[in-house]
Curated annotation (Swiss-Prot):
One of its GO terms (biological process) is proteolysis. Belongs to the peptidase S14 family. Residues 8-30 have a biased composition (Low complexity). It comes from the Eukaryota. Residues 1-43 form a transit peptide. It is found in: Plastid, Chloroplast. GO terms for molecular function: ATP-dependent peptidase activity; serine-type endopeptidase activity. SUPFAM superfamilies: ClpP/crotonase. Disruption phenotype: Embryo lethal. Component of the chloroplastic Clp protease core complex which consist of at least 16 proteins: CLPP4 (3 copies), CLPP5 (3 copies), CLPR4 (2 copies), ClpP1 (1 copy), CLPP6 (1 copy), CLPR2 (1 copy), CLPT1 (1 copy), CLPT2 (1 copy) and 3 copies of CLPP3 and/or CLPR1 and/or CLPR3. The core complex is organized in two heptameric rings, one containing CLPP3,4,5,6 in a 1:2:3:1 ratio and the other CLPP1 and CLPR1,2,3,4 in a 3:1:1:1:1 ratio. Residues 7-32 are annotated as: Disordered. The gene is CLPR3. This is ATP-dependent Clp protease proteolytic subunit-related protein 3, chloroplastic.
Amino acid sequence: MASCLQASMNSLLPRSSSFSPHPPLSSNSSGRRNLKTFRYAFRAKASAKIPMPPINPKDPFLSTLASIAANSPEKLLNRPVNADVPPYLDIFDSPQLMSSPAQVERSVAYNEHRPRTPPPDLPSMLLDGRIVYIGMPLVPAVTELVVAELMYLQWLDPKEPIYIYINSTGTTRDDGETVGMESEGFAIYDSLMQLKNEVHTVCVGAAIGQACLLLSAGTKGKRFMMPHAKAMIQQPRVPSSGLMPASDVLIRAKEVITNRDILVELLSKHTGNSVETVANVMRRPYYMDAPKAKEFGVIDRILWRGQEKIIADVVPSEEFDKNAGIKSVV
């Protein structure tokens, strides 16, 4: 057992003739230097095996981000801080694509021993920015790795915010076919509720069903939506029963009703609507664009490309008529 442990420890050490796992006792500075090198090598090896959720290569946000990382990686490094906008969303702000990018604030403790090199791949870059990207339906593999990422980011720094970017159809596919159990969404939701970090949720495409619940479960005031994204809430669907006995179908139907009631209660809690209101709108699929989602309480802010400032500068109609010398007759 000791020999196995020694062998595994040796495999983590840098391959250098000047380094020894047992530094001479006569040199304290050499021992401290060797210990620091060992810790760095151990952290680097451990971080290299962090699991990542599957990524859709056709996703528009990821495609744009990957293009920038490939052509201008220096624009993603040493970015200035902008706390008002979640990280990497400024790639949509100008045709130059991040000509003045915003820095992703990182943990000081983590940065202390990190090499200043670009992340090796796109998933690593997202995780480096404390971003959990949900870009596929909530199947078991996606749920497992999203929960693992949330736990890892909290362990890394429980004070830094975690960003969840959502473009998911929940537990169904685009055509409405059920591909996952409702428990997949509840598992991620329960993990969110256990976090000590602030959770910033952003809908960058679609948030349907359980994905809409995750969008609304972010920290109040930190729930965002892109201008043309969609959100939709609906009742849980019964999976295909096939040749299942009638008694088993009845049991499954009761479970679906239970999941529906839980979903209604959670949406009521996070949107500020009554249980009756949520239950009524969920009788049929209830689609919401960004303004409607904000009105319903799913999000707090729409990430416009400067339109908010433009709209704020528009002169009200009454003042415009007054300046133009137009008198309104009632």
